[in-house]
Swiss-Prot record:
GO terms for biological process: canonical Wnt signaling pathway; cell fate commitment; cellular response to starvation; chondrocyte differentiation; cornea development in camera-type eye; forebrain regionalization; hematopoietic stem cell proliferation; iris morphogenesis. A lipid is attached at S243 (O-palmitoleoyl serine). It is found in: Secreted, Extracellular space, Extracellular matrix; Secreted. It comes from the Eukaryota. The lineage of its organism: Eukaryota, Metazoa, Chordata, Craniata, Vertebrata. It comes from Homo sapiens. This is Protein Wnt-2b. GO terms for cellular component: collagen-containing extracellular matrix; extracellular region; extracellular space; intracellular membrane-bounded organelle. It is linked to Diarrhea 9: An autosomal recessive form of chronic diarrhea characterized by neonatal-onset of osmotic diarrhea that is not substrate specific, abnormal crypt and villus architecture, and significant fat malabsorption evidenced by high levels of fecal fat. The keyword Phosphoprotein does not apply. Isoform 1 is expressed in adult heart, brain, placenta, lung, prostate, testis, ovary, small intestine and colon. In the adult brain, it is mainly found in the caudate nucleus, subthalamic nucleus and thalamus. Also detected in fetal brain, lung and kidney. Isoform 2 is expressed in fetal brain, fetal lung, fetal kidney, caudate nucleus, testis and cancer cell lines.
């Protein structure tokens, strides 16, 4: 959807090439809607201050849990650059919040059959707990998909006319060609340039301040996530001509479903490269002699993953006790692997589902209730040492 008012948008935030920094206009006096929103969110701020612990070493991920409509100065863990962008672009922060929820859902989908299943912690402003403190391949995946989620959400919001500072991609103009022949750029191409630019400015801001080995790792994986979204842009076209002869085509670029990005990054996780920082701290080298060097599309990590089989609060592992597993599967969702050899309990449960649905004119669908009894298998907890005093 191409929104009117392009000249006004250009005045607020000129669209430049992807390498250009995100321009920041001088803050204007808040209008009535913004002022009322700030007043209405004072209650949310109070709740935030009451529920969060005193330590606020966290990240922008919490925006997805809080929602973007918060007072930017009081979101824990934002660095000054992120606060500036939050204050000046509150509508984009709404997209950042939506993107955070989207990538967390995707992370949980990708690892639903894994010992570590991307569990978020309620009332924990770090979102994932201590597990992200380790520079593991799980941390590499989370940073990559979080960056990708922001790009995807902002890009989509631009072309749907939800943001005042961007609209359709201004670079897809004129004639072009592909394997099928020539076509004209038209319609509303998704503005991936703006999405990547803003995501880089906002998400990378904290890591660019720190400038240590972990920050270097995070920046690399953030870039992998942004690149993954761009990788799956697709060309959509409409034919023009007599009886659909397609003598002329009008085409535009569109985002693919975020699942494709998630699937790709999961494959990158499986092939992630263990590295170590060079002495000058400016690059990576292979962690051990004989290991392959990381490329720009590889996820990288420093540390081996903790043992996710057992509860380990210090490492952030929740263990697999109580996790549902498949008795017949030989994969990571199978009881043998998921339960780490501890065995499993079986519970017989009755599930009620709708079945034999029929359409009745007009206009209703009526279904019967069907009851199915199934066996649910859950992992046993680790046995306590026999020498421990049980009294």
């Amino acid at each position: 959807m191409l929104r009117p008012g392009g000249a006004e948008e250009a005045a607020q935030l000129p669209l430049r090439r992807a390498s250009a920094p995100v321009p920041v206009p001088s803050p204007a006096a808040p209008d009535g809607s913004r002022a009322s929103a700030r007043l209405g969110l004072a209650c949310l701020l109070l709740l935030l201050l009451l529920t969060l612990p005193a330590r606020v070493d966290t990240s922008w991920w919490y925006i997805g849990a809080l929602g973007a409509r918060v007072i930017c100065d009081n979101i824990p863990g934002l660095v000054s650059r992120q606060r500036q962008l939050c204050q000046r672009y509150p509508d984009i922060m709404r997209s950042v919040g939506e993107g955070a929820r989207e990538w967390i859902r995707e992370c949980q989908h990708q690892f639903r059959h894994h010992r570590w299943n991307c569990t978020t912690l309620d009332r924990d402003h770090t979102v994932f707990g201590r597990v992200m403190l380790r520079s593991s391949r799980e941390a590499a995946f989370v940073y990559a998909i979080s960056s990708a989620g922001v790009v995807h959400a902002i890009t989509r919001a631009c072309s749907q006319g939800e943001l005042s500072v961007c609209s359709c991609d201004p670079y897809t103009r004129g004639r072009h060609h592909d394997q099928r022949g020539d076509f004209d750029w038209g319609g509303c191409s998704d503005n991936i340039h703006y999405g990547v630019r803003f995501a880089k400015a906002f998400v990378d801001a904290k890591e660019k301040r720190l400038k240590d080995a972990r920050a270097l790792m995070n920046l690399h994986n953030n870039r992998c996530g942004r690149t993954a979204v761009r990788r799956f842009l697709k060309l959509e076209c409409k034919c023009h001509g007599v009886s659909g002869s397609c003598t002329l085509r009008t085409c535009w670029r569109a985002l693919s479903d975020f699942r494709r990005t998630g699937d790709y990054l999961r494959r990158r996780y499986d092939g992630a490269v263990q590295v170590m920082a060079t002495q000058d701290g400016a690059n990576f080298t292979a962690a051990r002699q004989g290991y392959r060097r990381a490329t720009r599309t590889d996820l990288v990590y420093f540390d081996n993953s903790p043992d996710y089989c057992v509860l380990d609060k210090a490492a952030g592992s929740l263990g697999t006790a109580g996790r549902v597993c498949s008795k017949t599967s030989k994969g990571t969702d199978g009881c043998e692997i998921m339960c780490c050899g501890r065995g499993y309990d079986t519970t017989r449960v009755t599930r009620v589902t709708q079945c034999e649905c029929k359409f009745h004119w007009c206009c209703a669908v009526r279904c019967k209730e069907c009851r199915n009894t199934v066996d649910v298998h859950t992992c046993k907890a680790p046995k306590k040492a026999e020498w421990l005093d049980q009294t």
